[in-house]
Structures are given as structure tokens and as C-alpha cells.
Design a protein with these regions (language model features):
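Extreme N-terminal basic, low-complexity initiation segments
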Residues: 1-10, 132
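A contiguous loop/helix-start segment that scaffolds small-molecule binding in enzyme catalytic cores
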Residues: 35, 193-260
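Structural signal for conserved beta-strand scaffold positions within catalytic alpha/beta enzyme cores
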Residues: 64, 91-94, 155, 175, ...
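Short gly/pro/ser/thr-enriched loop/turn and capping motifs at secondary-structure boundaries
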Residues: 69-71, 98, 160-163, 230-232
Length: 260
């Protein structure tokens, strides 16, 4: 007996050896739906994985992080790779941009309730996320809650935005024993830039002026990519040229200062 992507697969020989109670347990487990948290990549539909595309085609419903599919970036990326999803059931899941723990908890619980209801109907759901589902993805909270309730939730990797950004810039993120640090926008900028190796500053839009100032003070090599793989993409190759009006989808890569 083996479990493959949330389903129990039993050989004929093993099935004959199962008790009636065990057979019923297997049937009930396989009747329940499941959910995939799918990373659609950073922006270009061509960067979405073959596995992600296959699972989107097979899914009964598509859950999107937003109110409408027309304005949901993750959905538009997936649509570019798999046009067939336009005919599927769309489930809007809204996560407010706030640090209020009570509001966040309420939105997570509402998301879990709506997704669980679909799985209770035996449906397979694909939840879309930008970049990679394991890197600062809101789905992570929902994933843990669904697992705790006994539902099958599987994470499907996508190309991380910082890997795509480095490729766009034509630079390496790590060489030899060089460490790589991934820092959220909420991390103290000054402390982060003191770390040795490559520093990847995610979602720094609101603090971009502070980040730029610290980068200029440290005189370390820095790059910025805005809207990687999307419309309005910008590549910046020095700290001095980083715009202070950079948008939400802005990512900065900083290296150690080169010794003269």
C-alpha cells in the first residue's frame, strides 16, 4: 500500500487481505478531495513547471489570492500557461494586507472553511501563489491549518522570484562557500546588510528609501529587479539608481563590498 499525492493506492493482493473496516477507511480517504498549493513562478508563464500545469488542468476548482481573477497576478500567470483554467470554478480567497493578528486569523479561518467545504465535496483544488509556495507565501498558514484538520494539502514548487531576478541580471546568487540570506521587508535593513555573503531583500517597496540609503553607506554592490517577468519590468544595476518609488514587486540583491 502506498500513498501517492494524497491518495492511497492498494494492489489487488493487498486489497484482498484488508479487513472490511480497513477497506472502508481507504474508500473514505480517497473520496475526500485534496488541495495543492501551487507556485506559479515570478511572472513569465513560460517559467511555470510542467507539474504545476498538469495539476491545474486536472483540478476541479482554482483558488486565487484575491477578489477577482482579472486583477489576480498569480491567476493571470497561470492562465498564460494553461488557458483551460478559464473554464474552471474560481474560488476567491482574500487575505488583507495588515499586521492586525485578529484580522489575519479571521481571514485564515474563512479561507480554511471555504476550501475545506470544496474538499468535503470530493473536489481537487489548486491554490495559486506567486513565485514558490514555500517562500513567504500566505498559503503556508492555510496549509498548516488544513493539515491539522486532517485534509490532504500538497505543496508544489515554483521558480522563486529571486532566482529569476538573478538570472535576469546575469549574476550568481552564491559561489563556493558564499552564504545566501533571504530577508523579508520587515527585517532591520542595517542588521541585514551586515550579514556576510549575498543578501536578498524581499518586498522592500515601503522601505525602499531606507534600503537605498544603507546600501549607499555600505558601498556594497547592489541590484534591483522590479516586476520580474511581468509588464513594467525594470532592471537596476547600482544602488545609486534604485528608484524610491519602486513598487510592491521589487527585489534587491546585495553582495559583500569588494576589497581593493
Amino acid at each position: 500500500m502506498a500513498e501517492i499525492e494524497g491518495r492511497l493506492h492498494v494492489s489487488r493482493k493487498d486489497w484482498k487481505g484488508c479487513t472490511e473496516l480497513k477497506k472502508q477507511d481507504i474508500k473514505e480517504k480517497n473520496m475526500q478531495g485534496m488541495i495543492y498549493g501551487i507556485g506559479v513562478g515570478p511572472g513569465n508563464p513560460e517559467l511555470m513547471t510542467l507539474k504545476a500545469a498538469r495539476l491545474l488542468r486536472e483540478a476541479d476548482a482554482i483558488a486565487i489570492p484575491g477578489k477577482e481573477k482579472e486583477t489576480c497576478t498569480a491567476y493571470q500567470i497561470a492562465l498564460g500557461a494553461v488557458p483551460e483554467i478559464e473554464e474552471k470554478e474560481i474560488i476567491p480567497v482574500v487575505f488583507p494586507m495588515t499586521k492586525d493578528e485578529a484580522v489575519l486569523k479571521e481571514s485564515h479561518e474563512a479561507a480554511v472553511k471555504s476550501l475545506a467545504a470544496l474538499m468535503d465535496q470530493g473536489k481537487t483544488v489548486a491554490f495559486l501563489t506567486l513565485g514558490d509556495v514555500t517562500v513567504y507565501s500566505t498559503y503556508g498558514y492555510v496549509h498548516k491549518k488544513l493539515l491539522a484538520l486532517g485534509y490532504e494539502s500538497v505543496l508544489i514548487n515554483g521558480v522563486p522570484s529571486f532566482c529569476a531576478a538573478a538570472a535576469k541580471l546575469g549574476i550568481s546568487l552564491g559561489e563556493k562557500a558564499e552564504p545566501i540570506h533571504i530577508l523579508p521587508g520587515s527585517y532591520p535593513v542595517k542588521d541585514g546588510l551586515k550579514l556576510s555573503g549575498t543578501k536578498i531583500l524581499m518586498k522592500s517597496g515601503k522601505k525602499i528609501a531606507d534600503v537605498k540609503r544603507e546600501l549607499l553607506l555600505t558601498e556594497c554592490p547592489a541590484w534591483m529587479v522590479e516586476n520580474c517577468g511581468m509588464e513594467g519590468e525594470r532592471l537596476i544595476r547600482s544602488a545609486a539608481d534604485i528608484p524610491e518609488d519602486a513598487g510592491y514587486y521589487s527585489l534587491i540583491i546585495a553582495k559583500d563590498r569588494e576589497e581593493q
